[in-house]
Amino acid sequence: MAKKSKIAKEQKREKLVAQYYELRKELKDKGDYEALRKLPRDSSPTRLTRRCKVTGRPRGVYRKFGMSRIALRDYAHKGQIPGVKKSSW
C-alpha cells in the first residue's frame, strides 16, 4: 500500500490538470509559451503518474483495469473482475 500522502498528492495533480486543461490548450495553440511557463507545474499532464486504484502502487499498472499486476491477480483469482479468468494451454 502506498503512502496516503502520495495518493493524495496524485489526486491533487489530477484536479489541477483538469482545471487548467482548456487554458493550456488555448495557450499552446497561440504559441504563448511565456504564459504557459507561468502556470503551476502540476497542471501539466506530463507530471501525472498512473497509480493502482486499489493499492496506490505506481509501478506495474495495467491501463485497461487501472490496477497493479498484484491487485489484478488477486481480484481475478477471486472472480471479482468480469470476463477475466485464468488461462491454461
UniProtKB/Swiss-Prot annotation:
<dbReference type="InterPro" id="IPR001209">
    <property type="entry name" value="Ribosomal_uS14"/>
</dbReference>
<dbReference type="InterPro" id="IPR018271">
    <property type="entry name" value="Ribosomal_uS14_CS"/>
</dbReference>
<protein>
    <recommendedName>
        <fullName>Small ribosomal subunit protein uS14A</fullName>
    </recommendedName>
</protein>
<keyword id="KW-0689">Ribosomal protein</keyword>
<comment type="similarity">
    <text>Belongs to the universal ribosomal protein uS14 family.</text>
</comment>
<keyword id="KW-0699">rRNA-binding</keyword>
<dbReference type="GO" id="GO:0003735">
    <property type="term" value="F:structural constituent of ribosome"/>
</dbReference>
<dbReference type="GO" id="GO:0019843">
    <property type="term" value="F:rRNA binding"/>
</dbReference>
<dbReference type="GO" id="GO:0006412">
    <property type="term" value="P:translation"/>
</dbReference>
<comment type="subunit">
    <text>Part of the 30S ribosomal subunit. Contacts proteins S3 and S10.</text>
</comment>
<dbReference type="GO" id="GO:0005737">
    <property type="term" value="C:cytoplasm"/>
</dbReference>
<keyword id="KW-0694">RNA-binding</keyword>
<dbReference type="InterPro" id="IPR023036">
    <property type="entry name" value="Ribosomal_uS14_bac/plastid"/>
</dbReference>
<dbReference type="GO" id="GO:0015935">
    <property type="term" value="C:small ribosomal subunit"/>
</dbReference>
<comment type="function">
    <text>Binds 16S rRNA, required for the assembly of 30S particles and may also be responsible for determining the conformation of the 16S rRNA at the A site.</text>
</comment>
<dbReference type="InterPro" id="IPR043140">
    <property type="entry name" value="Ribosomal_uS14_sf"/>
</dbReference>
<dbReference type="Pfam" id="PF00253">
    <property type="entry name" value="Ribosomal_S14"/>
</dbReference>
<keyword id="KW-0687">Ribonucleoprotein</keyword>
